[in-house]
Swiss-Prot record:
Recorded family membership: Belongs to the YopE family.
PROSITE patterns: BACT_RHOGAP
Location of region: Disordered: 1-37
Induction: At 37 degrees Celsius in the absence of calcium.
Protein name: Outer membrane virulence protein YopE
Misc remark: N-terminal is important for export, C-terminal is indispensable for virulence.
GO molecular function: GTPase activator activity
A GO biological process held by the record: negative regulation of phagocytosis
Domain annotation Bacterial Rho-GAP: ranges: 101-219
Gene symbol of the encoding locus: yopE
One term under GO cellular component: cell outer membrane
Disulfide bond entries: none
Cellular location(s): Cell outer membrane
Organism in which the protein naturally occurs: Yersinia pestis
Comp. bias intervals (Low complexity): 8-32
Amino acid sequence: MKISSFISTSLPLPTSVSGSSSVGEMSGRSVSQQTSDQYANNLAGRTESPQGSSLASRIIERLSSVAHSVIGFIQRMFSEGSHKPVVTPAPTPAQMPSPTSFSDSIKQLAAETLPKYMQQLNSLDAEMLQKNHDQFATGSGPLRGSITQCQGLMQFCGGELQAEASAILNTPVCGIPFSQWGTIGGAASAYVASGVDLTQAANEIKGLAQQMQKLLSLM
C-alpha cells in the first residue's frame, strides 16, 4: 500500500455526543467515555468504612471494660474496709527481771570467774606486783576482775554473802583498801611505784584471795 493512500483513509468520527459521555465506533466497536465530573461524583457517592475502624472500636471497648472493673474493685475495697473495726494489738508489757533472778545471775558469774582470779593472785609476789600491777588492775586482770565480782555480790546479794564481800573490799592492803588496788592512777599505783614493802602487799593480797573461797561456799 502506498503511503499516500494510507493517509487519505479517514477514521470514523463519533456519531453522537450527549451531555456527559461521547459515543463512537472504532474498528467496528462502540466506545463510550465518561466526563471527569461524572467520574468524580461516582467516587464521592461510594461509602466504604476506613481501614482499622473496627480494631479501634474493639480496643476502646476493651479499655472501657477494664476501667469499669478497676473502679468497681476500688469501690468494693473502701466499702468493705469502712465496716471493719480497726483492731489495735495490745502492747506487750516489758518483762523486767526479778531481783531474785538478777541476784542468781550475779552469783553464777562470780562462781565461774572468781576461781581463775584467785589462782592468779595466790602466785603473786613482790616482783610480779611491781612489774604487772597496771596489767592486773585493768581489763580482765586478776585484781580488777576479783574486785569487780566482789562489788557485784556486795551490791546485789544480801545476807552473809553481802557482808563477806564488803569485808574483803574494805580490808586494807598496806593501808590502802583492797578495792583501790583494782584501779590505776590512784593510791595503789603510787604505792607500787615507790617500791616499799611490796612483799608485804603481795602477801596481804594473797590472804584476801584465800578469803574469797568463803564467798564461793556461801553461793
